[in-house]
């Protein structure tokens, strides 16, 4: 560092330590906020939506305002990192050999959403990403085997036409509301949640 950037090594070490602390603080606050959202929707009898996606989908120009389509209707939106326990899910019964953290978080969210009454799952994909093809199938399989929830998969492209996406979101919300109403009518908050068996 000193030779290349004229920065002392001890200064770099201190800066790195501060950055690690800041990152840890941010992650703790994000998890805390996620727990608060879950508590609020539980008390209100509602639900939140977890949008499982890749980092570039945080850009409104890429996601075309999808999170806002839920929040405008009073449905809170969580990112995978804000879902309590997302780093502690046992994925040994997944059919996929997990090769990166993004895949792990999406699959972990599927397991958590399937077993949490106050959560629903939306997966965003772009540009026909090859990995998303089998991730989508595995997310649907895992959630289907564990319970009655069906995730929404929405493929985004370069078009900014909002109409079709709005229709998809409204249809998804209506399906979720109908399923939840049927479950309440049966006297249960959710259908039975089954453990994920060994797929082989």
In which residue ranges do the predicted regions lie?
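An N-terminal assembly and electron-transfer interface module characteristic of large anaerobic redox
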Residues: 1-200
């Amino acid at each position: 560092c000193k030779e290349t950037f004229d920065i002392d090594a001890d200064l770099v070490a201190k800066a790195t330590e501060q950055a690690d602390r800041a990152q840890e603080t941010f992650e703790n606050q994000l998890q805390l906020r996620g727990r608060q959202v879950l508590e609020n929707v539980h008390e209100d009898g509602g639900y939140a939506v977890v949008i499982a996606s890749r980092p570039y989908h945080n850009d409104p120009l890429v996601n075309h305002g999808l999170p806002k389509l839920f929040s405008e209707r009073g449905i809170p939106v969580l990112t995978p990192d804000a879902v309590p326990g997302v780093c502690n899910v046992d994925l040994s019964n997944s059919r996929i050999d997990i090769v990166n953290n993004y895949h792990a978080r999406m699959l972990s969210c599927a397991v958590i959403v399937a077993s949490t009454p106050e959560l629903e799952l939306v997966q965003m994909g772009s540009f026909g990403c090859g990995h998303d093809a089998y991730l989508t199938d595995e997310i649907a399989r895992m959630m289907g085997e564990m319970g009655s929830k069906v995730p929404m998969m929405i493929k985004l492209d370069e078009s900014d036409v909002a109409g079709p996406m709005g229709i998809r979101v409204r249809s998804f919300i209506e399906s979720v509301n109908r399923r939840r109403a049927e479950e309440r009518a049966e006297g249960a908050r959710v259908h039975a949640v089954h453990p994920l068996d060994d797929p082989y």
